[in-house]
Amino acid sequence: MANTYKSIAVSIIFLLYFSCVSSQQQTKFLNHGFLEANLLKSGSSKIHPSGHLELTNTSMRQIGQAFHGFPIPFLNPNSSNLVSFPTSFVFAITPGPGAPGHGLAFVISPSLDFSGALPSNYLGLFNTSNNGNSLNCILAVEFDTVQAVELNDIDDNHVGIDLNGVISIESTSAEYFDDREAKNISLRLASGKPIRVWIEYNATETMLNVTLAPLDRPKPKLPLLSRKLNLSGIISEENYVGFSAATGTVTSSHFVLGWSFSIEGKASDFDITKLPSLPDPLPPLSPSPSPPVSVMKNSSNTMLIIIIAASAIFGILILSFLAVCFFRRTENFTGGARKFSHQTISSATGGFDNSKLLGEGNSGSFYKGQLAPTEIIAVKRITCNTRQEKTALIAEIDAISKVKQRNLVDLHGYCSKGNEIYLVYEYVINRSLDRFLFSNDLPVLKWVHRFCIIKGIASALQHLHAEVQKPLIHGNVKASNVLLDGELNARLGDYGHGSRHSTTGHVAPELVNTGKATCATDVFEFGVLIMEIVCGRRAIEPTKEPVEISLVNWVLRGVKSGNLLRRCDKRIKKKNLVSEEVLLVLKTGLLCVRRSPEDRPMMKKVLEYLNGTEHLPHDDYVV
């Protein structure tokens, strides 16, 4: 008996341990540069080929923002108490002509809706109406390079802690503590040099610490700002974390080179050698010229001619370079599908190296590739068995390349060599839906995201079936062929080009007999897929009890027993569920998987059901 108790205790410890590890994996990240980071960018923000994030350039009255692609859970799921969090990042502010402005902020916000926010002193987060409003629920740490007296700024080079507005509750001039000399040393924020920041919140002690240092210095023992602060009334269950910067009539380029974040534990440290380099600073302004005098006339004309000639030569060189790049990357265009050279595709994927492999399916393998420093692609490699198959596939590619819709993955072009075809797609950053549904390594999808994904897939299929010149059949509607972008919108991929290999559990009955895919077989597969999305399980799970092996039969039993709502994924928090939408989707799914293809709704009707513009037939869900 004692041994039994010991075994149980050990098992519990291991479960708790792996639960913590899993949670930590979901809420911890480290970015050396941002080329492959999962960021939601807006305004003037962009990622440069070197990997650094530019929030604003030196144009006036800009707002640039970049947030982590997923909201972060800040409450302990067991106690609902706020958790501790550390973050560290490296930034640089390069002033434009004249004085620098206005600054950047690290931000924790429940929403990414900053509509109406002003640039300049308001840092793209607030405006004159909502500044200081407790309903904002925003925490920011600002790095301000302009003194706004009306906002109680202490100087034009300070760090401040902001709650719900840009009037800081705590601020001080930018400096760092030198451990060797045991004194504070001034630090110019807009020096153009990289500065490292540590922001740490201890939930137990309700203490927020902010520490600064030059990039080449270790973390100081003493923080710059230390504020007793209970954030439980500010930070809600899930929040977005990221950066916001703004310019006004005075400007700066605001850069972020690296970012580390963690819930609980310790934020991962940077390897400084892996951080991207900053662009060269702008040359200083020349002093105003003296009034022209006659002896300078010939010299000025000569200089003007030299400048014009140099500009023309430079322009010709740039155009030549672009032309060479264009013709090297593309051989020709055939009916809308761009044809890439095999050398270009092979180089982009590292010779189809296994480290670039994204996944494999019945119809081909997918590889990640990089055409240019900021152009990431996905390449599908297909082997054709006959010349006729290859010819038919190329003809279909031309048609597919013309199909554009917000919920479909874009096909950029293709490459043909020997008996192989390579399809070049846009790369969708969050990859496939099945990773989120059937794995515990990623955050659990909220119901609001699942419902949006379902409607997105329906919209994509409706476009393929009825909104193109010639209807296109997908033939393989399943979770691994649905990709998610940075905002978790659905992007249906791998449509057309002979991908007629439906997965077990998704196959319509008539497809088994005829082998012919139709709009109705797509509808059947869609019905199974949306039940997977709601229930968080696969269509066929042989290890379950006999009555639960088939998802469709299990859901149908839920209808008959009056327990349909209990079929929903248990991992979704009940308070985030919309019961009416869950029931709507499951009942729509059952309509889509009816045995007779004539009894299944068209995708147009399915969209009307999901959008609430058409009522479901009354209790008519028997498959």
UniProtKB/Swiss-Prot annotation:
- Its principal location? membrane
Q: Could you say which residues bind ATP here? A: L358, G359, E360, G361, N362, S363, G364, S365, F366, K380
Q: Which positions carry the signal peptide feature in this UniProt record?
A: 1-23
Ranges for domain Protein kinase: 352-616
Q: Which UniProt keywords apply?
A: ATP-binding, Cell membrane, Glycoprotein, Lectin, Membrane, Nucleotide-binding, Plant defense, Receptor, Signal, Transmembrane, Transmembrane helix
Alphabetized InterPro entries for the sequence:
ConA-like_dom_sf, Kinase-like_dom_sf, L-type_Lectin-RKs, Legume_lectin_dom, Prot_kinase_dom, Ser-Thr/Tyr_kinase_cat_dom
Tell me one GO biological process term: defense response to oomycetes
The entry assigns this protein to a family as follows:
In the C-terminal section; belongs to the protein kinase superfamily. Ser/Thr protein kinase family. In the N-terminal section; belongs to the leguminous lectin family.
Can you name this protein?
Putative inactive L-type lectin-domain containing receptor kinase III.2
Report a single Gene Ontology molecular function: ATP binding
Return the Gene3D superfamilies for the record: 2.60.120.200, Phosphorylase Kinase, domain 1 (3.30.200.20), Transferase(Phosphotransferase) domain 1 (1.10.510.10)
Null phenotype?
Increased susceptibility to the oomycetes Phytophthora brassicae and Phytophthora capsici.
Q: What does this protein do?
A: Involved in resistance response to the pathogenic oomycetes Phytophthora infestans and Phytophthora capsici.
Spans annotated as Legume-lectin like? 26-262
Give compartment(s).
Cell membrane
Q: How does it sit in the membrane?
A: Single-pass type I membrane protein
Positions of disulphide bridges? none
Stretches that traverse the bilayer: 304-324
Which residue stretches are annotated as topological domain Cytoplasmic? 325-623
